[in-house]
């Protein structure tokens, strides 16, 4: 007779969870950061707020962002004037947009990941969908299942309202699913659209303006599984270890609240210092078992909440200037896409590593770290092992 322990052993994969493919997508509408303040204050009928516009211009200039992609065009905003006011009741209009557009953008990223993976979509066993852009029932996970034509018995997980740390969360969950379900192939999708947070400027809510200067739209998808099929599935990164922690004394550092006016964003100025003060503890926990204490010897993927966070982390740890190269590139080209950001960076790193003729997907290095930072203040840590390019 078979024992419970024997059944459990048979259910588990042998090797570590591995990323097999990555796909990304953005809306077609591209916004240049240099001209965005003019557009933003014009479309929100706020051109008379000259001092506020000058502040916003400085925020945009210091953001290290060149361009972003947004579903919201001038035409859409003119058709929905309530989105352009500050705190006008507008949740219905926002919901009507994102309930359709979030799964649609997610499908675009997922389709690219599935194509790179090279296996039939019928082999997908689990789906994790993550968004901070709107809520609905049945959720975006259900809508994506229909859009992609996945099997109706794919096991789905819907993560709403997690915010900017969630790119790490989805990898942590995917790792647990892949390693504890032999043969599992997990499709992970993060899709974010700023239609929930866009609103006109206010002198009394400057942290909302920070969000208007940083956030962009994007979706990213990865395929995760254990025990890659030889000559069929190409391993990109192994997910070796994960952790989640709430930073001490950080309550209220980053908040978001769903209101009649959409999703409001609140940010304390000391977020960069809170992150930089606590990041070394997370690194020690991850890398001490490997006897690694030189953090310039690993590759880096950090959620680019803004340039100040990256600057302070680099300064605190004495990181070389190019350590955050992939992270800064994604911030520059796309802005802060919340949960999707770190997956975009993962994609950029493996692409550039191959393009530059480096030996591994992690800039030629063996070990690396992925960090998600977000509401809480919550930090997600993922220890990565790179693979041959």
Curated annotation (Swiss-Prot):
One of its GO terms (molecular function) is naringenin-chalcone synthase activity. InterPro entries: Chalcone/stilbene_synt_C (IPR012328), Chalcone/stilbene_synt_N (IPR001099), Chalcone/stilbene_synthase_AS (IPR018088), Polyketide_synthase_type-III (IPR011141), Thiolase-like (IPR016039). One of its GO terms (biological process) is flavonoid biosynthetic process. It catalyses: (E)-4-coumaroyl-CoA + 3 malonyl-CoA + 3 H(+) = 2',4,4',6'-tetrahydroxychalcone + 3 CO2 + 4 CoA. Pathway: Secondary metabolite biosynthesis; flavonoid biosynthesis. The active site is at 164. It holds the Pfam family Chal_sti_synt_C. Its EC number is 2.3.1.74. The keyword Cell division does not apply. It is an enzyme of class 2 (transferase). PROSITE patterns: CHALCONE_SYNTH. It comes from the Eukaryota. The keyword Acyltransferase applies. Keywords: Acyltransferase, Flavonoid biosynthesis, Transferase. PANTHER family: CHALCONE SYNTHASE 3 (PTHR11877:SF100), HYDROXYMETHYLGLUTARYL-COA SYNTHASE (PTHR11877). The primary product of this enzyme is 4,2',4',6'-tetrahydroxychalcone (also termed naringenin-chalcone or chalcone) which can under specific conditions spontaneously isomerize into naringenin. Belongs to the thiolase-like superfamily. Chalcone/stilbene synthases family. This is Chalcone synthase 1A. It comes from Pisum sativum (Garden pea). The lineage of its organism: Eukaryota, Viridiplantae, Streptophyta, Embryophyta, Tracheophyta.
């Amino acid at each position: 007779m078979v024992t419970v322990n024997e059944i459990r052993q048979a259910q588990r994969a042998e090797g570590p969870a591995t990323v097999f493919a990555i796909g990304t997508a953005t809306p077609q509408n591209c916004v240049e950061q240099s001209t965005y303040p003019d557009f933003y204050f014009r479309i929100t009928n706020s051109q008379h707020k000259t001092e506020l516009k000058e502040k916003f211009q400085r925020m945009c200039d210091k953001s290290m962002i060149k361009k972003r992609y947004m579903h919201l065009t001038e035409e859409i905003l003119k058709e929905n004037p309530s989105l352009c006011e500050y705190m006008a009741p507008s949740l219905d209009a926002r919901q009507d947009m994102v309930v359709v557009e979030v799964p649609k953008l997610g499908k675009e990223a997922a389709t690219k990941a599935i194509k790179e993976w090279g296996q039939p979509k019928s082999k997908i066993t689990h789906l994790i969908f993550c968004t901070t852009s709107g809520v609905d029932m049945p959720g975006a996970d259900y809508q994506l299942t229909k859009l992609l034509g996945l099997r109706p018995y794919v096991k789905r997980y819907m993560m709403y309202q997690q915010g900017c740390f969630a790119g790490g969360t989805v990898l942590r969950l995917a790792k647990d699913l892949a390693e504890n379900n032999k043969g599992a192939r997990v499709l992970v999708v993060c899709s974010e659209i700023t239609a929930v947070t866009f609103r006109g400027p206010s002198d009394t809510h400057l942290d909302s303006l920070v969000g208007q200067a940083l956030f962009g739209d994007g979706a990213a998808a990865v395929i995760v599984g254990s025990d890659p099929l030889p000559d069929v599935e190409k391993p990109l990164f192994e997910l070796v270890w994960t952790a989640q922690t709430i930073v001490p004394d950080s309550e209220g550092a980053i908040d978001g609240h769903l209101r009649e006016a959409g999703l409001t964003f609140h940010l304390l100025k000391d977020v960069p210092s809170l992150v930089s003060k606590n990041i070394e503890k997370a690194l020690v926990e991850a890398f001490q078992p490997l006897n690694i204490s030189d953090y310039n010897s690993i590759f880096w993927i950090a959620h680019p909440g803004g340039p100040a966070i990256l600057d302070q982390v680099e300064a605190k740890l004495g990181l070389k200037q190019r350590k955050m190269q992939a992270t800064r590139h994604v911030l520059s080209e796309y802005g802060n896409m919340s949960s999707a950001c770190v997956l975009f960076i993962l994609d950029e790193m493996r692409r550039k590593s191959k393009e530059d003729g480096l030996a591994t997907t992690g800039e030629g290095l063996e070990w690396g770290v992925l960090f998600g930072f977000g509401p809480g203040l919550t930090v997600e840590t993922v220890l990565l092992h790179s693979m041959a390019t």
